[in-house]
From Swiss-Prot:
Protein name per Swiss-Prot or TrEMBL: Large ribosomal subunit protein uL30
Database matches in Pfam families: Ribosomal_L30
Lineage: Bacteria, Pseudomonadati, Pseudomonadota, Alphaproteobacteria, Caulobacterales
HAMAP family recorded: Ribosomal_uL30_B
Alphabetized InterPro entries for the sequence: Ribo_uL30_ferredoxin-like_sf (IPR036919), Ribosomal_uL30_bac-type (IPR005996), Ribosomal_uL30_ferredoxin-like (IPR016082)
Organism: Caulobacter vibrioides (strain NA1000 / CB15N) (Caulobacter crescentus)
Gene name tied to this protein: rpmD
């Protein structure tokens, strides 16, 4: 069985003074502190969440 594609993201920005939905999106991605790294399945819903808070994230290669 083929291994599922994944994407790894690191939080680079603080959720302080951000809209409530952006903070909730970070929590949904498993991020709640600057510098935290999370590996997620690469699917359209995850990509949409990443795009919503892309200014607070960095894609880790």
């Amino acid at each position: 069985m083929a291994e599922a594609k994944t994407v790894t993201v690191r939080q680079t920005g603080s959720p302080i003074r951000r809209e409530k939905d952006q903070r909730a999106t970070l929590v949904g991605l498993g991020l709640n502190r600057v510098g935290r790294v999370s590996t997620l399945q690469d699917n359209p819903s995850t990509r949409g969440m990443i795009r919503k808070v892309q200014h607070l994230l960095e894609i880790v290669e």
